[in-house]
Amino acid sequence: MSASIRDAGVADLPGILAIYNDAVGNTTAIWNETPVDLANRQAWFDARARQGYPILVASDAAGEVLGYASYGDWRPFEGFRGTVEHSVYVRDDQRGKGLGVQLLQALIERARAQGLHVMVAAIESGNAASIGLHRRLGFEISGQMPQVGQKFGRWLDLTFMQLNLDPTRSAP
């Protein structure tokens, strides 16, 4: 798959919205049940920009969004600065082509460049592809929480994975 990874722009929001709403309606990757509108994604985009956090997109030669990735604060308390939670979503017809790896690798590089310390992934425990992707890039399972969510008429379990971006770094 020939795709370029780049910073997202406002023009990418309709493509991001379509991928997001597909995940809402058809997967357990997002635990929301109600699709969102473009204003919601614009507010999310603006919030990431204010916080200095990236939104990356994988796009084809025509600029069409094939996937996206981002991170934001893990928790809103000062003691968690340096730790972010990330998301990676790939368009349904593009899954299994390596875009998730490309997006997550680029996101890890960006987090390291920003001097962050830990990246956290919160993954529905049945999502073997996402767990495998994260393991491949060095993430380790750090916890599991059974039946903490629900969607599609069933309980969902949550697996936490994390990557220490600089294990030799001293505490501040």
UniProtKB/Swiss-Prot annotation:
Enzyme Commission number(s): 2.3.1.-
The keyword Metal-binding belongs to this UniProt entry's keyword annotation: no
Signal sequence segment: none
Disruption phenotype annotation: Cells lacking this gene do not have acetyltransferase activity and induce a degradation of proteins. Growth in succinate medium with glutamate, ammonium, urea, and proline as nitrogen sources is stopped by the addition of 200 uM MSX at the beginning of the log phase, and no further growth is observed for the next 12 h. Growth with glutamine as a nitrogen source is unaffected.
Alphabetical UniProt keywords: Acyltransferase, Transferase
Residues that coordinate or bind acetyl-CoA: 88-90, 96-101, 127
Enzyme superclass (EC): transferase
SUPFAM superfamilies associated with the record: Acyl-CoA N-acyltransferases (Nat)
Example GO molecular function: acyltransferase activity, transferring groups other than amino-acyl groups
Reaction(s) the record says it catalyses: L-methionine sulfoximine + acetyl-CoA = N-acetyl-L-methionine sulfoximine + CoA + H(+); L-methionine sulfone + acetyl-CoA = N-acetyl-L-methionine sulfone + CoA + H(+)
Residue ranges annotated for the N-acetyltransferase domain, each copy included: 3-166
InterPro entries, per the entry: Acyl_CoA_acyltransferase, GNAT_dom
CDD domains: NAT_SF
Coiled-coil portions: none
One family name in Pfam for this protein: Acetyltransf_1
Residues at which substrate binds: 75-77, 85-87
Function comment: Plays a role in the resistance against the toxic effects of L-methionine sulfoximine (MSX), a rare amino acid, which inhibits glutamine synthetase (GlnA). Catalyzes the acetylation of L-methionine sulfoximine (MSX). It can also use L-methionine sulfone (MSO).
Quaternary structure, from the entry: Homodimer.
Protein name: L-methionine sulfoximine/L-methionine sulfone acetyltransferase
Originating species: Pseudomonas paraeruginosa (strain DSM 24068 / PA7) (Pseudomonas aeruginosa (strain PA7))
Upper lineage: Bacteria, Pseudomonadati, Pseudomonadota, Gammaproteobacteria, Pseudomonadales
